[in-house]
Amino acid sequence: ISTSKLCVSYTIWKVGDYDASLGTMLLETGGTIGQADSSWFKIVQSSQFGYNLLYCPVTSTMSCPFSLDDQFCLKVGVVHQNGKRRLALVNGNPLECLFKQVQ
């Protein structure tokens, strides 16, 4: 399925099923707002100018995706699949993002 076609209709990210060939889970479009098990992400500052994207699934009724405690969150990074770069959950080397204020 072409990602460009999915982005036209679906704009909510989610974590897909485990991909054994990559050893991780890829990010996909087609999520649902408020879907606690696969669509809760947050942005955290990683350096003076950079930010990381974290996937923070709710594991119990006591957990909250907006909490300051990131111990239950997983990092989002880049993996290579069939010559293409894909966003995925990673153990190390998270993708560092920079944001520029639009004027």
Swiss-Prot record:
Entry annotated with the keyword Coiled coil: no
UniProt keywords, alphabetically: Disulfide bond, Protease inhibitor, Serine protease inhibitor, Vacuole
Primary localization class, coarse: other
Coiled coil: none
GO function terms (MF aspect): serine-type endopeptidase inhibitor activity
Record localization: Vacuole
UniProt keyword Nucleotide-binding, yes or no: no
Top-rank taxon, per record: Eukaryota
Entry-linked SMART domains: STI (SM00452)
This protein's GO CC annotations: vacuole
Disulfide bonds: C56-C73
Site (Reactive bond for chymotrypsin): M25, L26
Gene3D superfamilies with a match to the protein in the record: 2.80.10.50
Family (UniProt): Belongs to the protease inhibitor I3 (leguminous Kunitz-type inhibitor) family.
Function: Inhibitor of serine protease. May protect the plant by inhibiting proteases of invading organisms.
Cited PANTHER family: KUNITZ TRYPSIN INHIBITOR 2, SERINE PROTEASE INHIBITOR 5
Name of the protein in question: Serine protease inhibitor 4
Species, as recorded: Solanum tuberosum (Potato)
